[in-house]
Amino acid sequence: MDDKKKVVYIAGPITGVKNYWEAFEKAEEDLIGLGYIPLSPAHLPQGMTNAQYARIDFAMIDSADAVLFLPGWENSEG
């Protein structure tokens, strides 16, 4: 039996969204409660370029088993 926890990347808008971290934190808490390992771009440091964020995000997505799309994800710049 495979006891490995599934990893879930949380996709959602950050740039220009006031209090964006609240939605990401709620999603993280929900995923942890369900036994998943969340990967959240909301924990990345501020001040990098969009290209730097994209490289990190793509690596996280590549490492994930699934993606959770938060409301407004389709409007995200990333």
What does each model-identified segment do?
Residues M1-G78:
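Conserved catalytic or regulatory cores that recognize and/or transform ribose-phosphate-containing ligands
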